[in-house]
């Protein structure tokens, strides 16, 4: 055993490998190690970072043509569906909210100008059940040319039926100038018709409940704006330019602790 070991000749540490004669006969051994394909491999959640960076890159080179708000429904998969389909169980609600924020920006692009990459990215995250519902809920005019739309403002909700006519306007069965006693509420309710110069072109029947006159007139205002777009799609830009409200999400600001109201403060008294 010791004789066989004595016959082995080791390389001197002071000499390079090229100085030995039999170097070509010695097999070159390299350290074999795995090189990951994904640059995010060494991060805490590689799958999430890969998807997020991919969407961010698509958004960077996507055309910046924004559609109207009513054409941008939110219809993304739930967190549980995302974790199962994308094999990403580590992502939390906060992380998935970052992904949906990018998807909302991509979804705001006008469909006619979306690139193939944008369309494919959106299709991967769209909930199939929501797609069916939006198809069934597509608003159309009936056989008489009447549109039925709904509007909200504060705690008030309104349903408006509108069809071509002579300018009649009823709210809960009463003429609108009788139902809304203050001029400011009357003007706000009919503002979309006045802005589009259609005061005498349509008959309007509105049903409204909840809230006070300010909220009810705002709900009727929003519903009429939607009805005008259904009746005449060419008025969409006019309604947008004249600042007609389609969806007003403002709410009453909550009262703060230590204050009499939301913003009002108690008088400071020196003690």
Swiss-Prot record:
* GO CC, any one term: mitochondrion
- Location, primary (coarse class): mitochondrion
Q: Where in the cell is it found?
A: Mitochondrion
Residues of the region (Disordered) are: 251-271
- What pairs make up the disulfide bonds? none
Q: Which InterPro entries match?
A: Ribosomal_Su5_D2-typ_SF, Ribosomal_uS9, Ribosomal_uS9_bac/plastid, Ribosomal_uS9_CS, Ribsml_uS5_D2-typ_fold_subgr
Record's Pfam families? Ribosomal_S9
Q: Where is the composition biased (Basic residues)?
A: 252-271
Q: What is this protein called?
A: Small ribosomal subunit protein uS9m
Q: Species name for this entry?
A: Schizosaccharomyces pombe (strain 972 / ATCC 24843) (Fission yeast)
The gene coding this protein: mrps9
């Amino acid at each position: 055993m010791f004789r066989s070991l004595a016959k082995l000749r080791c390389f001197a540490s002071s000499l390079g490998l090229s100085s030995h004669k039999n170097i070509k006969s010695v097999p070159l051994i390299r350290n074999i190690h795995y090189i990951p394909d994904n640059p995010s491999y060494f991060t805490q959640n590689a799958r999430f970072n890969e998807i997020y960076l991919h969407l961010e890159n698509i958004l960077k080179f996507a055309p910046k043509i924004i559609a109207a708000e009513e054409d941008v429904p939110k219809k993304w998969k739930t967190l549980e569906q995302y974790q199962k389909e994308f094999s990403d169980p580590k992502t939390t609600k906060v992380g998935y909210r970052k992904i949906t924020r990018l998807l909302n920006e991509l979804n705001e692009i006008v469909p006619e100008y979306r690139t193939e990459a944008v369309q494919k990215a959106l299709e991967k995250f769209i909930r199939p059940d929501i797609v069916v519902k939006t198809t069934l809920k597509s608003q159309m005019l009936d056989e008489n040319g009447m549109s039925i739309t709904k509007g909200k403002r504060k705690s008030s909700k309104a349903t408006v039926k509108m069809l071509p006519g002579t300018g009649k306007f009823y709210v809960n069965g009463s003429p609108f100038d009788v139902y809304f006693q203050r001029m400011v509420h009357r003007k706000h309710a009919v503002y979309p018709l006045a802005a589009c110069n259609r005061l005498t072109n349509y008959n309007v029947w509105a049903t409204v409940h909840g809230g006070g006159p300010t909220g009810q007139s705002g709900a009727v205002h929003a519903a009429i704006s939607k009805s005008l777009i259904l009746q005449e799609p060419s008025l969409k830009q006019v309604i947008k330019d004249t600042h007609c409200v389609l969806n007003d999400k403002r709410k009453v600001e909550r009262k703060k602790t230590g204050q009499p109201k939301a913003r009002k403060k108690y008088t400071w008294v020196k003690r």
